[in-house]
Structures are given as structure tokens and as C-alpha cells.
Curated annotation (Swiss-Prot):
Record gene name: QQT2
Motif position, Gly-Pro-Asn (GPN)-loop: 108-110
PANTHER family: GPN-LOOP GTPASE 1, XPA-BINDING PROTEIN 1-RELATED
Organism, scientific name: Arabidopsis thaliana (Mouse-ear cress)
Keyword list, A-Z: Acetylation, Coiled coil, Cytoplasm, Cytoskeleton, GTP-binding, Hydrolase, Nucleotide-binding, Nucleus
Entry keyword annotation includes Ligase: no
Protein name: GPN-loop GTPase QQT2
Length: 379
């Protein structure tokens, strides 16, 4: 094996172990932060497909918070971005060098982004601590994520970061939709399915931001969400399998549409920003009423399961002690078994040696007898 490949594999294993340790650390801190939960600032995690205008939309949010005299705090989690149109208070690029990660681990672009995010997640408890110290002075924390949406939404590091935020502050996920491209019913349904998967994976309030309304009005999307018959009429002319599937899904997603907030925005003109922040405030209240209670219940369940596991282990140890009648409980008998085996092998060797000695002595006696017989014959 190439030494460089072996070193790279070892680095990846160490990175994975750090990620697991970080997750355990964040879970412990989350369990102890229930009483220290802060109602402000509101964390806004912005996600979206590549090309949906996510970074431009975040830039507009930064400008709006400045114009409205609100206090915002910006966190950039995209290690591959060359330049940002806004200043980031916390930038992953200051901690992790994306191109160096690609060289060191022999990775491609997507693997480099994922590994950079993993490395940053191992220290994310420090990021939360920094925001906690400034919590009383902030209204919003705006979080920009990598352009490859699946790297954040479906990775362990993305789950760590989301859970760390949600366990300490009111957290809302914003899914940015490319409105002109979603004018196709099939593309619209694909976007809605992805938004639905994010909602159920994060278990956090979700706000749909239909971006680029300066190019295409988003009213058609709202109509499709409010009345499935309008959507079915739009897709009626298409007889393909995907159209039939989308037609069926429009009924299944009706309940999903009722439980999310949707707004039309324009990152270029700034239209819809007031409505967006109203939706964020309403989602933060929903978080405190519904999602926070669910989060506390899940924490309690984890703690209960952990206590049950500890009790089970203690009970098992107690039974082992009783069965040994106060003697030492041998947890690993490998050495004992090995010593017994070695002793048995030595005894077998001694027996073989004795047998060989007896055979040699018998041979010697036989030779003496033959000599005597020979002498007697010649005499």
C-alpha cells in the first residue's frame, strides 16, 4: 500500500473519531443547556439548491437587518466560496483551508467541502459559546451553508451544527426556491419533496422563500400549494410516469403545505423582506411552543435510555459478583487460558522427551545383545 494512501486513511479515521467526540460533547452540553436556553437571537439557517440565489438572498438579509436597525450576526459555513458579498463574523475559511484539505486527503471538490465541514464541526461548541456571550446584543444569526445542499442537510456534521444551534437558540430553516425554474410542475414538486425531507429530518420550523420574484411572480406556486386541483390541471397535459407520480404526490403533500410558511422575495430588489421576517418571527414562536417541547421530550428520552443502560450494566455486574461469591470477577480470561495452554504444551513436550529417551535406551540394549550374540558365534 502507498504510504501516502495509508496516511490519508489514518487521517480520515482520526477525523471521524473527532467528529464522534464532538457530537458527544455537543449532546452533553445540549443536555445541560436546557435551563440556559435563550429566546434570542433567532438562528436562520439558509439552505437551497445550487443556483437558487441563496448567497445573494443572505446578502439581502444582511442589508435588511442593517437598514432596520436590527442586530445581525453572520456565520459562513461554505469553505469553497471564493468571495462573499457580505462580511462574515465567523467564517469557516478562517479555520479550515479548503484546498489544503483536498491535497492532504486526496479528495475531489465535494469531498473537500464535506471534510472541511466535518473538521469545523469538531470545534462547533466554541462557535455556540461565542454567540452565547453576545446573545443579549443580537436579534438574528444568519447562517450561510454550502451550495451543494446535500453536503449540509444529509451529513453528520450538518446534523451536529443544526442540533447545536437548536438546543440553545430558537432555530428556523429557510429553504430558498428558484421561482422561475419551479414554474414547471415537475420541478416544483421536486423542490417540495426536498423541502419536506428537510422538515422531517431537522424537525425544525421551515420557511419557503420563493426567490427571484423580480423575474417571475410566485403566485402560481402558492395556488398550487393551496389547491391541488389547480396543480393537477397544470400537469394534466403531461401523460408521463413522472407527471402521474407528481399528480398523486400533490394530494399527499397537502398536509405538508398547511404547516409551512411561504413568502415571495427578491434578493436583487429586496421585495418581500418584511414579509419574510414576519414569517421568521412567527416560526420562532412556533418553535418555542411546539418544537422546543418536542426537543425537551427527546432529550428526556435519551437521558432515560442512558439511565436504563447504566442500571442494566450495574445489575449485570452485581450478578457477576454474587456468582463469584465475592471473588474477583475475571473480565478477560485470555491470559489465564493462554497460561493453561502453555502449561499443557510443556507437559506434552516432557512426555515426548521421556518416550524418546526410553526408545534410545532400548535401542542401546538391543545393540549390546547383538554384539554378544556375534561374539558368541565367532567363538
Amino acid at each position: 500500500m502507498d504510504p501516502m494512501e495509508s496516511s490519508s486513511e489514518q487521517d480520515i479515521v482520526e477525523e471521524s473519531q473527532k467528529l464522534v467526540d464532538s457530537l458527544d460533547k455537543l449532546r452533553v452540553s445540549a443536555a445541560s443547556s436546557s435551563s440556559n436556553f435563550k429566546k434570542k437571537p433567532i438562528i436562520i439557517i439558509v439552505v437551497g439548491m445550487a443556483g437558487s440565489g441563496k448567497t445573494s438572498f443572505l446578502h439581502r438579509l444582511v442589508c435588511h437587518t442593517f437598514d432596520s436597525k436590527s442586530h445581525g450576526y453572520v456565520v459562513n459555513l461554505d469553505p469553497a466560496v471564493m468571495s462573499l458579498p457580505f462580511g462574515a463574523n465567523i467564517d469557516i475559511r478562517d479555520t479550515v483551508k479548503y484546498k489544503e484539505v483536498m491535497k492532504q486527503y486526496n479528495l475531489g471538490p465535494n469531498g473537500g467541502i464535506l471534510t472541511s465541514l466535518n473538521l469545523f464541526a469538531t470545534k462547533f461548541d466554541e462557535v455556540v459559546s461565542v454567540i452565547e456571550k453576545r446573545a443579549d446584543q443580537l436579534d438574528y444569526v444568519l447562517v450561510d451553508t454550502p451550495g451543494q445542499i446535500e453536503i449540509f442537510t444529509w451529513s453528520a456534521s450538518g446534523a451536529i451544527i443544526t442540533e447545536a444551534f437548536a438546543s440553545t437558540f430558537p432555530t428556523v430553516v429557510t429553504y430558498v426556491v428558484d421561482t422561475p425554474r419551479s414554474s414547471s410542475p415537475i420541478t416544483f414538486m421536486s423542490n417540495m419533496l426536498y423541502a419536506c425531507s428537510i422538515l422531517y429530518k431537522t424537525r425544525l420550523p421551515l420557511v419557503l422563500a420563493f426567490n427571484k420574484t423580480d423575474v417571475a411572480d410566485h403566485k402560481f406556486a402558492l395556488e398550487w400549494m393551496e389547491d391541488f386541483e389547480v396543480f393537477q390541471a397544470a400537469i394534466q397535459s403531461d401523460n408521463s410516469y413522472t407527471a402521474t407520480l407528481a399528480n398523486s404526490l400533490s394530494l399527499s403533500l397537502y398536509e405538508f403545505y398547511r404547516n409551512i410558511r411561504s413568502v415571495g422575495v427578491s434578493a436583487i430588489s429586496g421585495a418581500g423582506m418584511d414579509g419574510f421576517f414576519k414569517a421568521i418571527e412567527a416560526s420562532a414562536e412556533e418553535y418555542m411552543e411546539t418544537y422546543k417541547a418536542d426537543l425537551d421530550m427527546r432529550k428526556a428520552d435519551k437521558e432515560r435510555l442512558e439511565e436504563e443502560r447504566k442500571k442494566h450494566e450495574m445489575e449485570k455486574l452485581r450478578k457477576d459478583m454474587e456468582s463469584s461469591q465475592g471473588g474477583t470477577v475475571v473480565l478477560n480470561t485470555g491470559l489465564k487460558d493462554r497460561d493453561a495452554t502453555e502449561k499443557m504444551m510443556l507437559e506434552e513436550d516432557d512426555e515426548d522427551f521421556q518416550v524418546e529417551d526410553e526408545e534410545d535406551s532400548d535401542d542401546a540394549i538391543d545393540e549390546d545383545d547383538e554384539d554378544d550374540e556375534t561374539k558368541h558365534y565367532y567363538l
